[in-house]
Amino acid sequence: MAKAKFERTKPHVNIGTIGHVDHGKTSLTAAITIVLAKTGGAQATAYDQIDAAPEEKERGITISTAHVEYETKNRHYAHVDCPGHADYVKNMITGAAQMDGAILVVSAADGPMPQTREHILLAKQVGVPAMVVFLNKVDMVDDPDLLELVEMEVRELLSKYGFPGDEIPIIKGSALQALEGKPEGEKAINELMDAVDSYIPQPVRATDKPFLMPIEDVFSISGRGTVVTGRVESGIIKVGEEIEIVGLKDTQKTTCTGVEMFRKLLDEGQAGDNIGVLLRGTKREEVERGQVLAKPGSIKPHDKFEAEVYVLSKEEGGRHTPFTNDYRPQFYFRTTDVTGTIKLPADKQMVMPGDNATFTVELIKPIAMQEGLKFSIREGGRTVGAGVVTKINN
């Protein structure tokens, strides 16, 4: 059967459901598809289909994730839902499921629970820009004062972790009632989607961000100069523009005198393109894999940062033993490994395989980085962890 062409008529947004186990994330995901299917905006997907999420590999880590897509009047959404708590932790840290926004599901009958807190904190750490709350299972709560109390608790918790708790939309409803086709259940789902449409901001497209290309390879072409190749991560590069070479050494300025793709000359390269960039007056030995080409002033090299990290379990091919303070593995950023030393917080003696942790890293050479940059931790060529830069320290 022929694949349907992806129609890009509406702006696209990536979202996901987060929250404590059994608070109804998967039921809500199913309910959204079933309610939107009535207006032709989705394919109705049953709970069991979503719950049997396939396993995926992201940077050597096994993650179970269910993907559904649907659309509202205004937008097209790709929605991720994970069966287990560990899958969320891995997903958010590796960026396997890049979220432009999240729907936090809280059971009105139970209120915020430990994983509710952990997911809010993780969302903040990894830079999920906005979230909307669905207060689920309201059909199980008879007392309106209790509902109000739970809503207050959720707002306080969001504010505590740096989200605007007072202004985040909280929609009360029952995913189960929506799945059963009850009008009040469906009404809440439609309200939720309106809130997601209006409150979760449209993401900035990669081409609208400053130019950045990680350097994968360097060649010298006799009579023409030095060419660096790589995949453009963001922005646009035009022939004749000034650019900087950032990371590993002192930042150098140069000019792009040519862009090539598939052996053809182009006027510009943009996000997603695999290109070769000809650099004016730059010698082959002045550039290396692991540096980046970037718009001048847009990114700086750093060697000290804080990170949120997931450490692979033994079953995932990770370490068999915990690591302690001053552990010195390799940190793989974009295209290269750099050795670094880990400093654990004072209250943490060690990090076990299968855990996630926050700690500080000091690299032996600076890397072009900004908050939100993903990396792997490697030991003797195998991946033992995955992380995201949450704060730059120098």
Curated annotation (Swiss-Prot):
Q: Note down the stretches annotated as region G5.
A: 174-176
Quote the subcellular location field of this record: Cytoplasm
Q: Which gene encodes it?
A: tuf
According to the UniProt record, where is the region G1? 19-26
Q: Say what the protein does.
A: GTP hydrolase that promotes the GTP-dependent binding of aminoacyl-tRNA to the A-site of ribosomes during protein biosynthesis.
Tell me which InterPro entries the record gives. EF-Tu_GTP-bd (IPR041709), EF-Tu_GTPase (IPR050055), EFTu-like_2 (IPR004161), EFTU_2 (IPR033720), G_TR_CS (IPR031157), P-loop_NTPase (IPR027417), Small_GTP-bd (IPR005225), T_Tr_GTP-bd_dom (IPR000795)
- SUPFAM superfamilies, per database record: EF-Tu/eEF-1alpha/eIF2-gamma C-terminal domain, P-loop containing nucleoside triphosphate hydrolases, Translation proteins
Instruction: Region G3: list its residue ranges.
Output: 81-84
Which amino acid positions bind GTP, per UniProt?
A: 19-26, 81-85, 136-139
Organism of provenance: Rickettsia canadensis (strain McKiel)
Gene Ontology terms, MF aspect: GTP binding; GTPase activity; guanosine tetraphosphate binding; translation elongation factor activity
- HAMAP family noted in UniProt: EF_Tu_B (MF_00118_B)
> Which EC class is the enzyme in?
hydrolase
Per its record, the protein catalyses: GTP + H2O = GDP + phosphate + H(+)
Q: Which family does it belong to?
A: Belongs to the TRAFAC class translation factor GTPase superfamily. Classic translation factor GTPase family. EF-Tu/EF-1A subfamily.
NCBIfam families reported in the protein's UniProt record: EF-Tu, PRK00049.1, PRK12735.1, PRK12736.1, small_GTP
Region (G4), start-end ranges: 136-139
In short, the EC number is: 3.6.5.3
Name the UniProt key words of this record, in alphabetical order.
Answer: Cytoplasm, Elongation factor, GTP-binding, Hydrolase, Magnesium, Metal-binding, Nucleotide-binding, Protein biosynthesis
Annotated stretches, region: G2: 60-64
Task: Tell me what this protein is called.
Answer: Elongation factor Tu
